[in-house]
């Protein structure tokens, strides 16, 4: 098998990068639609007088922030020269674990492990923002 020339490798990389960009753009548009649906769902839950609706409202708010953070991550990807900053993934992880704490608190061990995971992610965020690991 003949080795590929540098220009062909760059062409393949460009094609794959464009496919990735198109996929992320499509995902961003789908998330915007879901964000709109969640807005309507939150408005419905806000005006329902039942106690269960308050629980749904809080859960919906956290899901709303997850959609919002994923959209912000995709926007940041395109604005920062096709690069995903690590801290955005950490923010999404923290929000997802907070959602788990609110929604799924069946066992006491989970109630202890979820905040420990958040602490680990906050330490990770602190390390990523320190001068030693900061990227220019």
From Swiss-Prot:
One of its GO terms (cellular component) is plasma membrane. Keywords: Cell inner membrane, Cell membrane, Membrane, Transmembrane, Transmembrane helix. It holds the Pfam family PsiE. It comes from Salmonella gallinarum (strain 287/91 / NCTC 13346). GO terms for biological process: cellular response to phosphate starvation. The chain crosses the membrane at residues 15-35, 55-75, 83-103, 108-128. It is found in: Cell inner membrane. Belongs to the PsiE family. This is Protein PsiE. It is a multi-pass membrane protein. InterPro entries: P_starv_induced_PsiE, P_starv_induced_PsiE-like.
């Amino acid at each position: 098998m003949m080795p590929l020339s540098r220009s062909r490798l760059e062409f393949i990389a460009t094609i794959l990068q464009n496919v990735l960009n198109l996929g992320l753009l499509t995902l961003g548009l789908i998330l915007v639609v879901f964000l709109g649906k969640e807005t309507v769902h939150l408005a419905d839950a806000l005006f329902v007088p039942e106690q269960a609706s308050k629980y749904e409202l809080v859960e919906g708010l956290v899901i709303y922030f997850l959609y919002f953070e994923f959209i912000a991550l995709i926007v940041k990807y395109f604005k920062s020269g096709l690069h995903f900053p690590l801290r955005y993934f950490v923010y999404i992880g923290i929000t997802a674990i907070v959602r788990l704490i609110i929604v799924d608190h069946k066992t006491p061990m989970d109630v202890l492990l979820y905040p420990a995971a958040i602490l680990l992610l906050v330490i990770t965020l602190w390390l990523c923002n320190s001068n030693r690991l900061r990227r220019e």
